[in-house]
């Protein structure tokens, strides 16, 4: 099957996307017209197919991605130099519900997970040390080093300390955000046992923090306040960890329905192929998972700007619509309160890859959540309560957003990328490449290649393989970030540091 040199994503579009580098003077046939390229245009970038006067909206995915800065001719390379965002401040929105019937068959798929005492299911069985404050990061790391040396991690998946810089010198919202994320980590089903490690004098007071955990498993979550230890806190910490480890290593995987999966949806280092390959692939999986009774979460609120009405109109009811309006406008207010324009999001890598405006990025980004209705809206630090597709308040920053997804209860994160990135958060963070060159050049980073979609592979066939891969990772196969040992957390901060 011959590979096409371009794709027109939506019949209403005024641009096509090049699937390979194209030269000035090359011609393409679009809608019965012959278009001659006026400049060399890289793969993933846009070519105008109709003349556009200054101020004319340019359409991609069937929606405006900005307007022409000057008059443009058919065949021109459309990029950040001649395309300007339409985004400004906060807006008023009207609820126009769209209830699309997906008609996806329910399958009896299962994975091998760890069923916890409270009924939640983990895809990993790990022992974690969670510092309440950054002052004890070194102690936490040393304890992990000692336990690894003593046990070799035999019988469990990993031993890890989740170090961070916070827990003290913070006020109000930042302080609560830190406490909520650390609480969520302690309660995460991927942990078979947790040692909460405190200094003792921090703002994040240990007794108050433990109360935040609610009705937790006291056998599997223990507290050590280092300032209260007379003598060597490492010795005392190891006593506790040995007991926690002994319990965790008795846990065994068992077959559970795929409806127990909670998956985070994230993208980073996006390019012009993101909205054509990897994001639609993840969207198809998200719809499939929701149809099985499972859960997916979309975040990166600033990267919804320009596509937010699509999500708002997919809300199951007016209450969720109003929550989504607040989700969007609150983040716009956050930008504006710091004197920053809401449309200045695409990074240099995004632009080099073919993304010119935030609308361009957002309309591709939101492909990750498919077409399922929005059934829940979460604030930062909230834990999942509703199955189905949820929206979560968090910024676009890769590590902050991925940490927020895992904190909400996702057992793994699906991360699409066109430029490539090695990082991972505290749950398996699977990388899905938008193009085959990335998958070929960085096999040590990439878990799955969606670039095959522009090389003749049918979506339904690739989705089937993708589902199998996700179930394999949920059942214990290491994601590349785990294999490489790239795992960390990052907590959102927007206030003063004392």
Residue ranges and their predicted role:
Residues 2-412, 419-422, 427-498:
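Metallocofactor- and cofactor-centric catalytic cores in central/energy metabolism, strongly enriched
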């Amino acid at each position: 099957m011959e590979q096409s040199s371009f794709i027109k994503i939506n019949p209403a579009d005024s641009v096509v996307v090049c699937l390979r580098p194209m030269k000035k003077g090359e011609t393409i046939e679009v809608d019965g017209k012959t278009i001659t390229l006026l400049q060399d245009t890289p793969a993933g970038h846009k070519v105008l197919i109709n003349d556009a006067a200054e101020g004319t909206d340019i359409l991609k995915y069937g929606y405006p991605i900005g307007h022409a800065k000057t008059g443009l001719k058919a065949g021109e390379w459309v990029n950040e130099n001649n395309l300007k965002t339409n985004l400004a401040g906060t807006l008023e929105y009207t609820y126009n519900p769209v209830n699309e019937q997906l008609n996806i068959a329910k399958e009896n798929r299962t994975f091998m997970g760890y069923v916890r005492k409270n009924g939640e299911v983990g895809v990993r069985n790990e022992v974690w040390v969670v510092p309440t404050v950054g002052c004890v990061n070194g102690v936490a790391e040393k304890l992990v080093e000692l336990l690894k040396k003593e046990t070799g991690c035999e019988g469990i998946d990993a031993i890890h300390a989740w170090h961070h810089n916070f827990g003290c010198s913070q006020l109000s919202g930042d302080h609560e955000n830190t406490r909520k994320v650390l609480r969520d980590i302690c309660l995460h089903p991927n942990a078979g046992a947790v040692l909460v490690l405190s200094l003792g004098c921090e703002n994040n007071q240990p007794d108050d923090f433990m109360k935040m955990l609610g009705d937790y498993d006291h056998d599997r979550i223990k507290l050590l306040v280092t300032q209260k230890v007379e003598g060597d806190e490492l010795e005392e910490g190891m006593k506790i960890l040995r007991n926690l480890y002994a319990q965790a290593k008795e846990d065994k995987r068992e077959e559970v329905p795929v409806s127990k999966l909670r998956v985070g949806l994230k993208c980073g280092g996006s390019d012009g192929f993101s909205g054509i390959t990897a994001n639609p692939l993840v969207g198809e999986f998200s719809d499939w998972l929701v149809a099985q009774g499972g859960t997916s979460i979309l975040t990166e609120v600033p990267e919804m700007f320009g596509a937010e009405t699509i999500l708002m109109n997919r809300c199951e009811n007016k209450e969720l619509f109003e929550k989504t309006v607040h989700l969007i406008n609150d983040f716009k207010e956050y930008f504006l309160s710091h004197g920053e324009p809401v449309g200045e999001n695409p990074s240099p890598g995004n632009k080099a890859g073919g993304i010119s405006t935030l609308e361009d990025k957002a309309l591709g980004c939101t492909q990750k959540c498919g077409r399922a209705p929005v059934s829940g809206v979460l604030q930062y630090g909230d834990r999942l309560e509703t199955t189905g597709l949820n929206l979560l308040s968090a910024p676009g920053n890769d590590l902050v957003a991925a940490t927020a997804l895992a904190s909400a209860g996702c057992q793994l994160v699906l991360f699409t990328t066109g430029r490539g990135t090695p990082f991972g958060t505290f749950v398996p963070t699977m990388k899905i490449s938008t193009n085959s060159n990335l998958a070929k050049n960085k096999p040590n980073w990439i878990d799955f290649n969606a670039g095959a979609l522009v090389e003749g592979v049918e979506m339904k066939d690739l989705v089937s393989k993708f589902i199998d891969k996700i179930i394999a990772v949920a059942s214990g196969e290491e994601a590349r970030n785990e294999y490489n040992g790239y795992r960390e957390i990052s907590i959102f901060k927007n206030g003063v540091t004392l």
